[in-house]
Swiss-Prot record:
Belongs to the RNA cytidine acetyltransferase family. TmcA subfamily. Its EC number is 2.3.1.193. Signal peptide: none annotated. Catalyzes the formation of N(4)-acetylcytidine (ac(4)C) at the wobble position of tRNA(Met), by using acetyl-CoA as an acetyl donor and ATP (or GTP). Keywords: Acyltransferase, ATP-binding, Cytoplasm, Nucleotide-binding, RNA-binding, Transferase, tRNA processing, tRNA-binding. GO terms for biological process: rRNA acetylation involved in maturation of SSU-rRNA; tRNA acetylation; tRNA wobble cytosine modification. This is tRNA(Met) cytidine acetyltransferase TmcA. Its main location: cytoplasm. Residues 349-531 form the N-acetyltransferase domain. It comes from Citrobacter koseri (strain ATCC BAA-895 / CDC 4225-83 / SGSC4696). The lineage of its organism: Bacteria, Pseudomonadati, Pseudomonadota, Gammaproteobacteria, Enterobacterales.
Length: 671
C-alpha cells in the first residue's frame, strides 16, 4: 500500500469513528510547507490554512480566525513556525469536522524551544519576541505521551501507522441526544427559577437552548454577548427565536416566559443580576474548558446568589465522538481541565514561592496552581498560560496542603521606567507596553515620576472555596509583601465591589484611583490600590489617596456612585491641580483623567468656556456639544476644550501658565 493509500485509509477510518487527529510536521519552513501541500493534494477537504503568509487558499491569519467560529472545515493547517497563537490553535481545532486532520507546522524539533516566538509580543510586555522554553517543553511532554498524535520530523523516516479500530460513530441527526433530551424534560417542567447548563465546546449547549425554545408553550427572549454567536441557537429555535442585546433588554420593558442567556459568563455579573430579576424563568448557558475562558468561576460567583439554582452539565460530544484524540491533545496541551473544586484540600497549609523553572523540574505543582486560577477566574485563557510559563517578571505563591493547592497568587513586576518616559506617560505622549498600574499611576495620577518606582501587581489571587474565610488570601498577600522588600509597593487593579474592597483593605491596601467608566468585563468601575513597602512607595500612596479624596465628590457625581474614601472639601487650585491642568491644556492628558482639577477650575474661573462647561457641568454628549458649537467632530471638540483651559490658566496667572507650558512640552522629547 502506498503512503497516500495508507493516509486515505486512516482518514476514512477516522471519519467512521468520528474522531480527529493532530499531525505535527517539524522542520524548516520550506520542508514543512511542501509536506503540508502534498497532504492537501492527497486528501479532499477544505484545508483551511492559518498563517500570517499562507501558500494556498482558503487561508486566514490567526487573528482573523475568530470571525470563522461557528463554521466547520474538513482538514486544516496551522503554521507555528514564527509563533504559536494558542487561542487561535484551540479555536481552529473546534471548527474541524469528524474525520479531519489538524496539521501543525513547527520549527525543527531540537531548536523549537530556543526560537523567539512572535506571539509573545501579545503577552510578554517585551518590545521584541522572546523564546518560550517552558511552553514548548510542555507541548513536547504532551506529545511524547500521546500515542494518537503523529509526529513527522525532517530527515527522519515516517510511515502512516495503523490504529486499533474504535466503535463506529453515529453523527447527530438534529434531534436531541439522550443527554440533551433528559435536560430538556427537566427544563420544560421547571417551576419559576434559574437553571444553568455548562459544557465544553462541541457538546450541543446552544442547540439545547434552541430546542427548549422550539418546544416550550410560552415565549422566550434570547440575549448574549453578541448576536453572531447565537446562529446555532437560532437555527434550532426556528420562528420563535427572538434576540435582544443585554443593554437593549435592560433599557426596555420587554418580557417573556423565559430569558435565555447564551454564554452568560461573558456578560458582566451586575448586568446579569439586573436582567435575572425581570424574568420568572431563566436559563444560563456557559462554556467550561474553553479557549474563550472558563465558566467555573462564573458558577461560583454568580450562581452562588441563587440557592435553588438547577445545574446541568452536557458531557457527551455532539460533533465528534467521545475520546476524540485531537480534543484530548488540545485540552491537555492548553490545560483546559481547570480545577472543578469537587475535592477540598485537607490539612495544614504551607506557603511557598516558586518560579517558572518549576514548569521544567516539577510541572505538577504549577499546573495545579494554573488550574486553580483558571477555575476561579472566567477570563483565564491560553494567553494567560503562555504568560505564566514564559513572560519575564512573573512571581508566584502557593498555599499548599500535603496533596492539593488551597490558594495561589500571581504577581507581575511593574514600573522602573526612566524619569523621561514616566513624564511622557504622565503628559499623554507615550503608552509603552505593560505596566498596567504603574502606567496608570502616571497617566491618571498626579505624580509625573510615579512610574519610576518599582511595584509588583497582584494579577490573580484565588483560594479554594472549601478553604475560604480562613485568612489564606490575606496570608498570601503577606507572603508576597515579605518577598518584595526591594520593591516600593504592591498594587492591585480590580472591578470595584464593596466585598472585594473589604478584602484588599484587610490586606492593608490604600485606595488611590477610581475609574470613570464601567468595565465591560465586570460591569464595575476599575479601582486601583497600593500597599506601600518603601518610604517612596508610602509617599506615592499618600499623595494619590489624598488626590482621590479631593476628587471624591466630583467623581461620585460623575459616576453616580459614592467613592469609598473620606472626601476632602477642595475648591481652590493647588500645585498639583495647576500641573494637571497644564498637562491637559498643553499636552495630551485625557479630559476625564483631569475631571477633578477641571471642575475646580470651572468653579474658580468666570470665563464662559462653553466646550468645557457643556461637557463637565451639563454632561452634554460629545455629539450634541459638537452640533451646538459647530464643530466637525470629537477631535475638534477636544482641541477646543484644551484651548479653553489654556485661556483660563493664562487669565488666572499668565507667567505661571507659560512656565508650566514650557515644562510639559519638553516632556514629549523622551528617550
Amino acid at each position: 500500500m502506498s503512503d497516500n493509500d495508507a493516509l486515505r485509509a486512516l482518514t476514512a477510518q477516522m471519519a467512521q469513528e468520528g474522531i480527529r487527529r493532530l499531525l505535527v510536521l517539524s522542520g524548516d519552513v520550506s520542508w514543512c510547507r511542501e509536506r503540508a501541500l502534498a497532504l492537501r493534494e492527497a486528501l479532499a477537504g477544505d484545508w483551511l490554512w492559518v498563517a500570517t503568509d499562507a501558500p494556498a487558499a482558503p487561508h486566514c491569519t490567526p487573528q482573523a480566525l475568530q470571525t470563522l467560529l461557528g463554521r466547520e472545515f474538513r482538514h486544516a493547517v496551522f503554521d507555528a513556525q514564527l509563533g504559536f497563537d494558542a487561542s487561535a490553535f484551540a479555536a481552529l481545532s473546534g471548527t474541524l469536522r469528524a474525520g479531519s486532520w489538524l496539521v501543525l507546522l513547527t520549527p525543527p524539533y531540537s531548536a523549537w524551544e530556543s526560537r523567539p516566538d512572535a506571539d509573545s509580543l501579545r503577552w510578554s510586555d517585551c518590545p521584541q519576541p522572546v523564546a518560550t522554553p517552558h511552553f514548548i517543553q510542555h507541548l513536547k511532554r504532551v506529545m511524547a505521551r500521546d500515542e494518537q498524535t503523529l509526529h513527522w520530523q525532517q530527515s527522519q523516516p515516517f510511515s502512516w501507522p495503523r490504529f486499533p479500530a474504535r466503535p463506529h460513530w453515529q453523527p447527530a441527526t438534529g434531534e436531541p441526544q439522550p443527554e440533551q433530551a433528559a435536560i430538556l424534560r427537566h427544563l420544560l417542567r421547571m417551576p419559576p427559577g434559574v437553571a444553568a447548563v455548562t459544557a465544553a465546546r462541541g457538546r450541543g449547549k446552544s442547540a439545547l437552548a434552541g430546542q427548549l425554545i422550539s418546544r416550550m408553550s410560552g415565549t422566550a427572549i434570547v440575549t448574549a454577548p453578541s448576536k453572531a454567536a447565537t446562529d446555532v441557537l437560532a437555527q434550532f429555535a426556528g420562528e420563535k427565536f427572538r434576540f435582544l442585546a443585554p443593554d437593549a433588554l435592560l433599557a426596555g420593558t420587554e418580557t417573556a416566559d423565559w430569558l435565555i442567556v447564551d454564554e452568560a459568563a461573558a456578560i458582566p455579573a451586575p448586568l446579569l443580576h439586573r436582567l435575572a430579576s425581570r424574568f420568572s424563568r431563566i436559563l444560563l448557558t456557559t462554556t467550561v474548558q474553553g479557549y474563550e475562558g472558563t465558566g467555573r468561576g462564573f458558577l461560583l460567583k454568580f450562581c452562588a446568589r441563587f440557592p435553588h439554582l438547577r445545574r446541568f452539565e452536557l458531557r457527551q460530544p455532539v460533533r465528534w465522538a467521545q475520546g476524540c484524540p485531537l480534543e484530548q491533545w488540545v485540552g491537555e496541551a492548553l490545560i483546559f481541565d481547570d480545577e472543578t473544586f469537587a475535592h477540598a484540600p485537607q490539612g495544614a497549609i504551607r506557603f511557598s514561592a516558586f518560579t517558572q523553572a518549576l514548569w521544567h523540574t516539577g510541572p505538577a505543582q504549577p499546573l495545579a496552581v494554573y488550574q486553580l486560577l483558571s477555575g476561579a477566574h472566567y477570563r483565564t485563557s491560553p494567553l494567560d498560560l503562555r504568560r505564566m510559563m514564559d513572560a519575564p517578571g512573573q512571581h508566584f505563591l502557593g498555599a499548599f496542603t500535603a496533596e492539593r493547592v488551597a490558594g495561589a497568587a500571581w504577581l507581575v513586576e511593574e514600573g522602573r521606567l526612566s524619569a523621561a518616559l514616566s513624564q511622557a506617560v504622565w503628559a499623554g505622549y507615550r503608552r509603552p507596553r505593560g505596566n498596567l498600574v504603574a502606567q496608570s499611576l502616571a497617566a491618571h495620577g498626579g505624580d509625573p515620576l510615579a512610574a519610576t518606582l518599582t511595584g509588583r501587581r497582584v494579577s490573580r489571587i484565588a483560594v479554594h472555596p472549601a478553604r475560604q474565610r480562613e485568612g489564606i488570601g490575606q496570608q498570601l498577600i503577606a507572603e508576597a509583601y515579605g518577598g518584595a522588600s526591594r520593591c516600593d509597593y504592591l498594587s492591585v487593579s480590580f472591578g470595584y465591589t464593596a466585598e472585594l474592597w473589604r478584602f484588599w483593605q484587610r490586606c492593608g491596601f490604600v485606595l488611590v484611583r477610581m475609574g470613570n467608566h464601567k468595565e465591560a468585563s465586570s460591569g464595575c468601575y476599575t479601582a486601583m490600590a497600593l500597599l506601600p513597602i518603601s518610604e517612596a512607595g508610602a509617599r506615592l500612596a499618600h499623595r494619590e489617596h489624598q488626590r482621590l479624596r479631593r476628587d471624591a465628590e466630583i467623581l461620585a457625581r460623575w459616576n453616580g456612585e459614592a467613592i469609598p474614601v473620606i472626601p476632602l472639601k477642595a475648591s481652590t487650585l493647588n500645585d498639583d491641580d495647576w500641573d494637571e491642568l497644564a498637562g491637559f491644556a498643553f499636552a495630551h492628558r485625557p479630559l476625564l483623567t483631569s475631571l477633578g482639577s477641571l471642575s475646580r477650575l470651572l468653579e474658580r474661573c468666570e470665563l464662559a468656556l462653553p466646550a468645557l462647561r457643556g461637557r463637565l457641568e451639563e454632561k452634554c454628549s460629545d455629539a450634541n456639544l459638537c452640533i451646538r458649537l459647530g464643530l466637525p467632530g470629537r477631535k475638534a471638540l477636544l482641541v477646543a476644550q484644551r484651548r479653553e483651559v489654556a485661556h483660563a490658566l493664562t487669565a488666572l496667572d499668565d507667567e505661571r501658565a507659560q512656565r508650566l507650558r514650557e515644562r510639559v512640552l519638553q516632556w514629549q522629547f523622551f528617550h
